[in-house]
Amino acid sequence: MAKNYYDITLALAGICQSARLVQQLAHQGHCDADALHVSLNSIIDMNPSSTLAVFGGSEANLRVGLETLLGVLNASSRQGLNAELTRYTLSLMVLKRKLSSAKGALDTLGNRINGLQRQLEHFDLQSETLMSAMAAIYVDVISPLGPRIQVTGSPAVLQSPQVQAKVRATLLAGIRAAVLWHQVGGGRLQLMFSRNRLTTQAKQILAHLTPEL
């Protein structure tokens, strides 16, 4: 069966978007607010009608992720910020694999996310209450699977409990995208053997987005 590289690229961009947001948060203490909203909202939608629907139904919602994906696919340097993004992206894929093989872990994750949906009736998605709840899911369900993702950035920034919660919530969104990536036919070998195909697809999607003014 032929791979749907459009869906695979969108899901991969979802992982990369989380990686980029984690990097921004760790270094600056803040990140692209619109992209963060899209990524966090993807956690909540358990029954999307399509891959694009997971990310709000608009390719533009994944602009940050698509641009990051191109950087990761074509990274000539294994040092600095690009190396961080590659490490976060690959680490999320490893954790997703461990999540799938850990008995009962996916069910636990689903039940905890259902709890988030109930909280959303009373609190905003980016409220401290929801951020803390999403961070707690990451700590309780994902972190024990190991190995833990080492987030690097400004030590002063990373000491903030609010930033820590946002980083963990964003990593949870990355796991969500990695689950989706696997569901639509994604696999790590594609990063080696289908790099050109993924690059072309990401460029095509970006090409028909309206430019940011």
From Swiss-Prot:
InterPro entries: HflD, HflD-like_sf. Pfam families: DUF489. It is a peripheral membrane protein. Keywords: Cell inner membrane, Cell membrane, Coiled coil, Cytoplasm, Membrane. GO terms for cellular component: cytoplasm; plasma membrane. Signal peptide: none annotated. It is found in: Cytoplasm; Cell inner membrane. Residues 99-126 form a coiled coil. Belongs to the HflD family. PANTHER family: HIGH FREQUENCY LYSOGENIZATION PROTEIN HFLD. Interacts with CII protein from phage lambda. Negative regulator of phage lambda lysogenization. Contributes to the degradation of the phage regulatory protein CII. Acts probably by holding CII on the membrane surface, away from the target promoters, but close to the FtsH protease. This is High frequency lysogenization protein HflD. It comes from Escherichia coli O157:H7. The lineage of its organism: Bacteria, Pseudomonadati, Pseudomonadota, Gammaproteobacteria, Enterobacterales.
